Amino acid sequence: MIVTVFRSRLRPGVREEYVALADRMNELARTMPGYISHKGFFAEDGERVTVVEFEHEEGMRAWRMNPEHRDAQKLARERYYDAYSVQICEVKRQNSFQRE
């Protein structure tokens, strides 16, 4: 499994407009081969974190290179982000617990 951790800080006053773009990108991500899930969080200090999971690197790469996603990335750099970072990780081990 490939996990992408995307951390960003938005410019003042753009959150509502940005969320509309992010919602569209989330819809698009779901159509990519090997897509598993994604979740986004806003922290109190203004940082936004999105975690995206793909079954394999090919799916993540297809997502990264998708033309609509590339256009959205460019727009976000120009208009919405003060800063961002991306970490791509391969899961070496996974553990979980669910109380019934």
What are these model-predicted stretches?
Residues M1-R48, E55-P67, Y81-E100:
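Short S/T/G/P-rich N-terminal loop/turn motif that feeds into the first structured element of a domain
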Residues E78:
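Cytochrome P450 substrate-recognition site 1
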